[in-house]
Amino acid sequence: MKLLVIGNGGREHALAWKLAQSPKVETVFVAPGNAGTAIEPKLQNIDLTAHQDLIEFCRKENIVFTVVGPEAPLAAGVVDDFRAAGLKIFGPTQYAAQLESSKDFAKAFMAKYNIPTAQYQTFENADAAHDYVNQKGAPIVIKADGLAAGKGVIVAMTLDEAHAAIDDMLLDNKMGNAGARVVIEDFLQGEEASFIVMVDGNNVLPMATSQDHKRLLDGDKGLNTGGMGAYSPAPVVTPVVYERAMNEIILPTVAGMKAEGHEFTGFLYAGLMIDQSGAPYTIEFNCRFGDPETQPIMSRLNSDLSDLVEAAIDGKLDSVTAEWSPQTAVGVVLAAQNYPETPKKGDVISGLDAANQVGKVFHAGTTANEKGDVLTNGGRVLCVVGLGDNVVQAKAKAYGALEKISFDGMQYRKDIADKAINR
């Protein structure tokens, strides 16, 4: 069968790569894809992004189903458009995707359905926001309401930082429409984890646990990014935390969306903060697989992903199980110079073949020129995954592969997975 994956990042490379491993799959088309998906066996890039063009392509090629990678097409209603055209697609509707595309929508939804999260208020008026912050004190968290590519969250450790973030979003329009409203919420202490599940509207199939590293620099310092690395499984998610996350967060969310008359289908990602007592709180929802979490998680999936997605689209997730490798996977992101602010593009990347002999290199912000050179073409350029019998071995494999790669201004964290190693 022929499948389609929408997107051009590392997450989409990993999803398409895993789908293509199925003996039932002939070709996975990636729209628009990157330099990695262009050369991966059984994958083929297509230069289409408009919904109607993609729908016509699916009809012409008899695509069995489509998987949506990034948040922007979901927020733009790609699932609604495909369903209206009678095509099978895995992802949430535009309404359901508001769990990610509007922080205010998500917080109000969590309050309504008693899903544990930080206390919050939403503001469009800067003066009112400044007053609220003065009343609450720091540390405090300022979030752009809309989609900001993972960079719309400011964890303000001082009042000055909080006031500056409010001005940036509400007065200086630094985030555009995404920051025209801000959600201000209490700062939660604890350890973060990514809890990702597949949902068919009613049933839930959990994916392997993982932990992302949002900050640019070692020791969780520097600016927030889309994610600088991840590992799976995440030992912070103990069996007890796992049960609590399912029963207190995931299942009430799925039931709540159904009660709202908008069944949730697709990948649902709860960004968790686990406090000292082991209680999970929801920091955010994403309505798609995480990036870079997808890369290590897919590296551990032994099941046929196409079977899981088909079951989810058909509302039969309760009839399948996901089998996972007992190994640990560590993925480290290589980012471009000046990421996350003004990443430099067009630098030649060398050492990819050598790195793939050691680990697995997933491409994100890459493109190829006429000569066949692979060039940087975005902020997060590559994600290098290593597998090992334990987290120490997996980390060594990932960094061993990464050392083969070079491009001008390449930056990466050296402490990915250290939280698991030091537990």
Where are the language model's segments positioned?
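Internal nucleotide-binding/catalytic subdomain
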Residues: 152, 156-294
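A conserved helix-loop-beta module that forms one wall/lid of the active-site cleft
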Residues: 90-152
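Solvent-exposed alpha-helices and their adjacent loops that cap or buttress functional pockets
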Residues: 21, 38-39, 90, 112-114, ...
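ATP-binding N-terminal substructure of ATP-dependent carboxylate-amine bond-forming enzymes
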Residues: 1-94
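Active-site "cap" helix and flanking loop/linker of ATP-utilizing ligase/carboxylase catalytic domains
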Residues: 246-268, 286-358, 369
